[in-house]
């Protein structure tokens, strides 16, 4: 993997083989880009996709972390640019008459559509279809869309990439005035992807800008649109909470270490539930926990748990990057005292129990119902005591 760097994803525990494809819908900023993880048919020969799709994302990641874009972007590309996901790229979709439940996933600040592949793969192996969005509000480390430059050429010949850089807060700017419009755009993008997949499940044609990908018509009748959840990490956690309120088709939300700051105070009386807040030990503040408690007070099925020994980036794929050089570039914020593989297992089990309960799934995930109450390995209910004062 170049310079001894690699990423070692947690082993998959579900019964399904996993397929993966990228979908870009539309030729403008208002379109959508997401990576779809899904149960697929077994295949003797399958291509495994790159974890980091392109070099531009390595450069964007370096820029987001405020390193030299040229040199550190190159280092990231050498260190992790050749790592691949253990899934079948554009693998044949495994149809299901009763349909799979759907999860829309929103990334955090500086993330992009592959930043939570470990969670996505595990959930897909358990029989979920997961759409990991790449937001176009300038909160992604890098993203792009393909615009048509000529009406006379064929659609693929006339496409030109337009890259959208990460938006940093400028001197003198109020951060809330930047982040609040972003979180609202992000929620709309979640709803847009939901609509695209609803069309695909209904057998309506969805044109994917990327050539040679999965035929989305194969999804027809195989997504259960009555069992849909929205999920996100950090900025994506706030996005999931807002999207749940704005779109009734979302039945519940999972907020991983949610960054509550971008949500306006007027939002809270309107907030819907249930929301499952899965926090880590060292990120939240008393103020943010109190905002979570406001939502929980309005919706008795909402819960807050904390994963002890975990840090903010423990909930991203970067927790599984090995090698000292790349690890140091991500700083001590990449790993906590809790083994990242143990943390992943605990969080996934808590998610599955919550999803079974609120999507009415007929699985055995209720064996982990105690995790929803903060009773389980490395879990506590609510927040650590030093954040618990109202």
Curated annotation (Swiss-Prot):
One matching Pfam family: PAF-AH_p_II
GO BP field: lipid catabolic process; negative regulation of apoptotic process
UniProt xrefs under SUPFAM superfamilies: alpha/beta-Hydrolases
Subcellular localization(s) per the UniProt record: Microsome membrane; Mitochondrion membrane; Cytoplasm; Endoplasmic reticulum membrane
Topology within the bilayer: Lipid-anchor
Cross-referenced InterPro entries: AB_hydrolase_fold, PAF_acetylhydro_eukaryote
EC number annotated for this UniProt entry: 3.1.1.47, 2.3.1.149
Active site: 234 (nucleophile), 257 (charge relay system), 312 (charge relay system)
Keywords: Cytoplasm, Endoplasmic reticulum, Hydrolase, Lipid degradation, Lipid metabolism, Lipoprotein, Membrane, Microsome, Mitochondrion, Myristate, Transferase
Lipidation, N-myristoyl glycine type: 2
Tissue-specificity statement: Expressed in kidney.
Function: Catalyzes the hydrolyze of the acetyl group at the sn-2 position of platelet-activating factor (PAF) and its analogs, leading to their inactivation. Hydrolyzes propionyl and butyroyl moieties approximately half as effectively as PAF. Also catalyzes transacetylation of the acetyl group from platelet-activating factor (PAF) to lysoplasmalogen and to sphingosine, producing plasmalogen analogs of PAF and N-acetylsphingosine (C2-ceramide) respectively. Has a marked selectivity for phospholipids with short acyl chains at the sn-2 position.
Family of the protein in this entry: Belongs to the serine esterase family.
Complexes and interactors: Monomer.
Protein name stated in the entry: Platelet-activating factor acetylhydrolase 2, cytoplasmic
Organism expressing this protein natively: Rattus norvegicus (Rat)
